[in-house]
Amino acid sequence: MKHSVLLLFLLFAATAAQARDPAQVRAFRHTHPCPATHSTTGACPGWVVDHLAPLCGGGADKPANMQWQRTAESYKKDTRERAYCKCIKTKSTHCVLP
């Protein structure tokens, strides 16, 4: 029974850690205006807010773990991170974020 409770806690914690908080993005944008428009609100053409360390890999959903990234570059990084996160879910010990 203790193992089941621990497993459920770990699964819940992993899922909760991946949740994105819009308030954290607003906090990031407040101190890091859009590179294209220099605005702290609204659209930022050609740019996205990116997590330096992926959430699935334990990265925090906090402004300190965020950066502006060009949209085209984000597609490449997202592809690599999805492969990494998929590997983590298999519990492999050989997962490397390229």
What does each of the following model-derived ranges do?
Residues 1-49, 53-98:
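Nuclease and nuclease-like effector domains acting on nucleic acids or nucleotide cofactors
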